[in-house]
């Protein structure tokens, strides 16, 4: 178990709407090793985002189990689950979810401050991460003064500020043009190689997915290895 950074076993997820029950995830099992770069591809409604939220402990499966670094998310208390997410995971979404009234630096510092870490250390770490994503010259700018690509880079820096082992990214380039998408992907590759951070990307962009070393295909709630 401990050889894997992430492992899920027979994950099922049902949603109940009145008398109707819909199964979104159907016996999903797979694993990731440290520093691996993996894409999950599939059409809208195939269950990709639901799986990602389940893997990150943001949603609970109806049955099955998820392990992060050998520790079960389902057996963890609420406080233990929060600590696991804070220690091992970073999250990036299609929409950056930056706080409009805060600068890029303050947005990136926020996860560390929420974790009650020293403000000076948080500032130093946030500056380092913004530099790593090529935004050291934009740290005092608010989101409204940044381009779409710059906002997503800030979101990536925020995901990295607690030095996670794994970043879960849900359509991280879904709102970006082709050129900006390429630059964000190059950044992800660079961070993967230089900092040994694993990335699990959910995307419908096959061109992007084909550049990753491993692809998984989600279809009708089933997950299988891609070509």
UniProtKB/Swiss-Prot annotation:
Main location: membrane
EC code(s) of this entry: 7.6.2.-
Enzyme kind, highest EC tier: translocase
Membrane topology: Peripheral membrane protein
InterPro entries, per the entry: AAA+_ATPase (IPR003593), ABC_transporter-like_ATP-bd (IPR003439), ABC_transporter-like_CS (IPR017871), ABC_transpr_LolD-like (IPR015854), LolD_lipo_ATP-bd (IPR011924), MacB-like_ATP-bd (IPR017911), P-loop_NTPase (IPR027417)
Location of the protein in the cell: Cell inner membrane
Keyword tRNA-binding part of the UniProt annotation: no
One GO-annotated biological process of the protein: transmembrane transport
Keyword ATP-binding applies: yes
Family label: Belongs to the ABC transporter superfamily. Lipoprotein translocase (TC 3.A.1.125) family.
Function: Part of the ABC transporter complex LolCDE involved in the translocation of mature outer membrane-directed lipoproteins, from the inner membrane to the periplasmic chaperone, LolA. Responsible for the formation of the LolA-lipoprotein complex in an ATP-dependent manner.
Description of how the protein assembles with itself and partners: The complex is composed of two ATP-binding proteins (LolD) and two transmembrane proteins (LolC and LolE).
Protein name: Lipoprotein-releasing system ATP-binding protein LolD
């Amino acid at each position: 178990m401990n050889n894997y950074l992430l492992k899920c076993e027979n994950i099922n997820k049902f949603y109940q709407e009145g008398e109707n029950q819909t199964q979104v995830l159907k016996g999903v099992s797979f694993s990731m090793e440290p520093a691996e770069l993996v894409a999950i591809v599939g059409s809208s409604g195939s269950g990709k985002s639901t799986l990602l939220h389940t893997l990150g402990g943001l949603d609970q499966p109806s049955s099955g189990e998820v392990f992060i670094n050998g520790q079960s998310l389902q057996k963890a208390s609420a406080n233990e689950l929060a600590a696991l997410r804070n220690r091992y995971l970073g999250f990036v979404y299609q929409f950056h979810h930056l706080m409009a009234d805060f600068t890029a630096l303050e947005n990136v510092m926020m996860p560390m401050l929420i974790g009650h870490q020293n403000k000076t250390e948080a500032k130093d770490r946030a500056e380092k991460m913004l530099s790593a994503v090529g935004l050291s010259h934009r740290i005092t700018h608010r989101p409204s003064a940044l381009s779409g690509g710059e906002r997503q880079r800030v979101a990536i820096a925020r995901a990295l500020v607690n030095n996670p082992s794994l970043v879960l990214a849900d359509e991280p380039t879904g709102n970006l043009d082709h050129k900006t998408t390429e630059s964000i992907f190059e950044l992800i590759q660079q961070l993967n190689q230089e900092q040994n951070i694993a990335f699990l990307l959910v995307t419908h962009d096959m061109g992007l997915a084909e550049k990753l070393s491993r692809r998984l295909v989600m279809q009708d709630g089933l997950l299988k290895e891609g070509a």
